Amino acid sequence: MDEKELLKKAFKYGNVPSNITYCFTEPCPMKDKCIHYLSALYKNEETDRGDAIFPNALKNGKCKYFAPLRVVKMAWGFDKLFAEMKVKDAPSLRAEMRDYLGSKGQYYRYKLRQLKLLPEQQKYIKQLFARYGYKDVEFEHFSDEIDFTKI
């Protein structure tokens, strides 16, 4: 499934953030790759208000709000990460992960799929495990999804 189809599907099933910013600037040369413009095309018919990027944001063919439509491999689930670990390493690794993710509650949201890890977060966590000597660690679940972090 290509990026645009994934975005359409996200709107169809309501899997888009409520704070998305739409763009309706037809003459923009980057519109076919911009998540703001494509979101305006695929939004639900019931959506009749929201934040927008105004046409005057486009200057000399460039827009400072341009954000590319990007599909990323999201991850969640930590049980596999800790499966082969020495008991003595687990508490300190969990503590460092909680610190990185923001809190104990956030840690469990990522563990239980309420939140999903971006590739950058996955990389950091794998590097954290590597510092303890665990090189081939994997998360339990993955899915290809639209990156809504730059909206």
Report residues per predicted region.
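DNA major-groove recognition helix of helix-turn-helix/homeodomain DNA-binding modules
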Residues: 120-137
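N-terminal cysteine/histidine-rich coordination modules
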Residues: 1-66
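Recognition helix of helix-turn-helix/homeodomain-like DNA-binding domains
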Residues: 103-118
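A short, Lys/Arg-rich alpha-helix, primarily the initiator
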Residues: 67-94, 135-137
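DNA-binding alpha-helical recognition surfaces that contact promoter or target DNA
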Residues: 36, 109, 127
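Short alpha-helical "recognition helix" segments of helix-turn-helix
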Residues: 91-100, 107
